[in-house]
Every structure is written in C-alpha cells, then in structure tokens.
C-alpha cells in the first residue's frame, strides 16, 4: 500500500482539481528524501522502455546530482493527495538539446515526466496532472508563452493525451536519442481552455 509522504511545506504548486476530485502538487526533488523512490520508479517495467534508466542506485544518485546542478532544468516530484506518484524535469528549451530543433524563444519551457507508481495507471488522471504541470510552468514565469514537448513517437499513451491538454503537434523530429513528436502548448490557448 502506498503511503502519503510527510507534509510538505515547500510545495512549488498545489491545487485541487475538480475534474478528478484530488489535489495535485509538485515539489522540488530532494536527493536524500527521493533517491530510493526515483530508483524504484526508474526500474519499473513500464518506465524502462522510455527512460532507459534501469540502473543501480548509485547511477540514479549521480543522475540526480547532475540534474540538481544543471541550471537549465529542475527536477520535481508530483503528488496526488500527498502521495508521490510521478517524476518531472522542467527545462528551458533554448538551453536544451531541443532548442536546436526549432526556433526556441528565450522563455520557452518544456518537461519530461514519468508516472512511477503503477497504482495510478488507468485512473483517468494523466490529463489532469499534465495540465497541472503545464499550468505550473506558465505560472512560474509570466514571460513563458509556450510550453514544448518532445515525446517519443512510441509514447502512444502520452500522445493520445496531448490534445486534451492543449498541446498541438508540430511534426516529427530526430533527436539524438529518439524520433519524437514536437508539441507546442501556447499560453493563450491554454488559458482559453483551462484558465490559470
């Protein structure tokens, strides 16, 4: 059985979602607190094909160190009603490898994510958590007019949710590690559909 984490005083985002009748929150990843959790998630059978991080805990610790030291991105843990369930990496697209594949603006943001807890699959919450993280990025910097994504063409489930989250397909691109769909979510369209 999943346990709620200890109460968080440093949530970066927290909002009740009436569509799923649950509270969605995000907090910065903390290495000491989250290492075993992220290691377990990276080794889940449903995560391995996309992330390719089924590695010893020492490798995940090094991965966390690199991400925490990287000024172009921030790692987050996603929670539903206080229970950790997902991992997110928010990045500045212009400073990311993706920024070489389209004319990135200075304030464009992007994210990578995984749902680590299998018990959260098939519950109809994926669009809600995607919208919540996208909203968080728009709120985090009012200058951000576009949130971008580059899911693998093989990530059919994630691609299926894109239109319900105001993401529009821009075409396919060949990144160093995958063939991907370039996706844009514009602030104005997001606000029209979901508000901030």
Curated annotation (Swiss-Prot):
**Keyword presence, Signal:** no
Tell me the pathway: Siderophore biosynthesis; rhizobactin biosynthesis
Is Heme tagged as a keyword?
no
GO MF, one term, reads:
N-acyltransferase activity
Q: Which Gene3D superfamilies match?
A: 3.40.630.30
Family listed: Belongs to the IucB family.
Q: What is this protein called?
A: Rhizobactin siderophore biosynthesis protein RhbD
């Amino acid at each position: 059985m999943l346990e709620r984490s200890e109460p968080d005083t440093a949530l970066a985002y927290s909002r009740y979602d009436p569509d799923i009748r649950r509270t969605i929150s995000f907090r910065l990843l903390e290495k000491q607190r989250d290492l075993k959790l992220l290691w377990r998630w990276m080794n889940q059978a449903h995560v391995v094909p996309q992330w390719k991080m089924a590695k010893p805990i020492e490798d995940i610790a090094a991965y966390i160190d690199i991400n925490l030291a990287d000024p172009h991105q921030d790692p987050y843990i996603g929670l539903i009603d206080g229970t950790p369930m997902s991992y997110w990496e928010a990045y500045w697209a212009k400073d990311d490898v993706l920024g070489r594949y389209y004319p990135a603006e200075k304030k464009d943001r992007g994210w990578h994510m995984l749902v680590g807890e299998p018990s959260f699959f098939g519950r109809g919450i994926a669009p809600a958590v995607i919208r919540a993280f996208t909203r968080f990025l728009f709120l985090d910097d009012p200058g951000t007019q576009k949130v971008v994504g580059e899911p693998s063409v093989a990530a059919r489930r994630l691609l299926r949710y894109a239109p319900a989250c105001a993401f529009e397909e821009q075409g396919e691109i060949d990144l160093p590690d995958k063939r991907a769909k370039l996706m844009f979510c514009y602030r104005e369209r997001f606000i029209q559909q979901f508000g901030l």
